[in-house]
Structure formats: structure tokens, C-alpha cells
Amino acid sequence: MPHYTFIEIGTSDFETLLETSNDTDIGLSVEPLSVYLNKLPNKQNVTKVNAAISDKNGEMSIYYVPPEIILAADLPWWFKGCNSVGHPHPTVSKCLSEMGKSQDFIMCDTVPVKTMETLIFENNIESIGTLKIDTEGHDCIILNNYITYCEKNPALFAKTINFETNVLSLVDDQEAVINRLLNNGYKLVSRNVNENTVLEKI
């Protein structure tokens, strides 16, 4: 079973680990919206997974503004990175209201959902270099499920974990996840309440 250089969950189609990876890196790029996943480059050792990640297997609703509407309605380009499972993205809804734009621009699709355990099993993953998560408020749910799995399978704890920590998730939830990782042998590298938090395995 291979070592994966990276697993990136929630890629959209910009600033991805896939784009900066080299030809020897083995990775997974996970994105529930195929319109963005398909725009990413194809690399020999990187697998694209068209799914959402959560704490259960099945299906979930994802809310997003299609790229053609972003362009036609002259909406901010970063809307394409604001796709949210379970409910509309609060920043998108607020921005549309402030711009006097219709909330009907927000579409809803049903997408397949996998747990980290399923993702790891399906791809025969033995170890992970970097786990990067950017899922617009769903990061702590994914990480709590992942940590619980790794506590029984410690070799699958990633060397580096990078996840989004901003207003889309509660600070208490962020701190609880960080403390669980610290208790499992990580050290805090950087903590930014408006951007990302990074931890490394000691």
C-alpha cells in the first residue's frame, strides 16, 4: 500500500496542492463539484475523487453558485471557492444580499459523500504526508471523524494537517480539534483564526 504525499479535500480549481505537485508525488484531490475538479490538471500519480467528505457515507446536498452565473452576473471570482454542504454558504448569501442580487443564483445538487475511513480504504492508503482540508465550515466534522479512526490506526495520522479556521466554524470546535491533535502527538505550527491552522506530527 502506498504512501500518499498529500490528500487535499475541497480543492475548487485554484491554489491546489495538485497544481504545485511534482511527477513523483502521489496524491488525492477531492472535490464534490465536477465542474471544478475537471478543470484541474491531470497528473499520473494523483487521483481525482468527485465526492464530499464527512462523518458518514451516503449523499448530501451541496450549495453553490455555478461558474457561468458568477461570470454573467459579475459576481466576485472567489464565489467559486465558497461551496457548502448541508446549507447555503453564509458569506455568499450575505454578499448577494448586499449586492442586490438574487438568492436564486445559489444552486443545490446532491453529491456522494465518503468518510475518511472509506477514502483511505478505497485508495489503499498506508500513510499520509499532508492532509489539507478547506470545506467551508465542515473541516472540524471531517477531522473529528478522521482522528477517531486514526486513534485505532495511528500509522494513518498525517505528518502535516492544514485546515481552515475562520468564522465558518465555531472557535470552540476548532480548539477541541486542535486539542485532540495535540493529545495525539502533534505540535501547533501556526494558528490563524481568520485563515488556516497547521499542525505537525512530532
Predicted regions: what they are:
Residues 1-202:
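Phosphate/nucleotide-binding beta-alpha loop and adjacent structural elements of enzyme active sites
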